[in-house]
């Protein structure tokens, strides 16, 4: 199967700043009960995804392009760059910020945690 990539502009995600572009590589239906989505996320300059907690899900991020700040479960601010992997476990919180003048591009996958009803 070949289909067009589904895209959506979302504003102030999880209380963050500005607009981000969500590109859905796999939708919830295509995840076959294993998670919510696999996507490419573009954070334009000076935008962010606000800090939030994952309940019943885990989320690995892979940084493809640009540089940013990963805010971990303890609110520690950690610089990230291409090739870095950020893993958010069930019950942990995180946020992602792009304080630069270039796009920050990540691949993220929201998967159901252990014991999560699918």
Question: How should each PLM-predicted stretch be described?
Answer:
Residues 1-36, 50, 117-118:
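A short, N-terminal "cap"/entry segment at the start of jelly-roll beta-barrel domains
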Residues 24-26, 39-55, 90:
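Conserved short histidine dyad/triad with adjacent acidic residue
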Residues 40, 60, 75-78:
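Short, surface-exposed secondary-structure edge patches
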Residues 60, 87, 102-117:
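A short hydrophobic beta-strand segment most commonly corresponding to one strand
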Residues 42-44, 53-70:
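Short, conserved beta-strand element in jelly-roll/cupin
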Residues 74-90:
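Short acidic-glycine-tyrosine-enriched beta hairpin
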Residues 45-47, 56-57, 76, 92-93, ...:
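A generic "binding-loop/recognition-motif" signal
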Residues 50-51, 70-71, 88, 94-101:
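Short beta-strand His + acidic residue motifs that chelate non-heme Fe in jelly-roll/DSBH
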């Amino acid at each position: 199967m070949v289909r067009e990539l589904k895209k959506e502009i979302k504003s102030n995600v999880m209380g963050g700043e500005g607009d981000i572009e969500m590109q859905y590589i796999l939708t919830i239906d295509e995840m076959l009960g294993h998670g919510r989505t696999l996507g490419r996320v573009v954070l334009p300059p000076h935008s962010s995804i606000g800090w939030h907690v994952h309940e019943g899900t885990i989320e690995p991020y892979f940084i493809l392009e640009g540089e940013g700040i990963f805010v971990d479960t303890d609110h520690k601010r950690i610089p990230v760059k291409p090739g870095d992997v950020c893993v958010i476990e069930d019950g942990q919180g995180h946020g992602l910020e792009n304080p630069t003048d270039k796009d920050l591009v990540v691949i993220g996958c929201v998967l159901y945690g252990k014991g999560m009803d699918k």
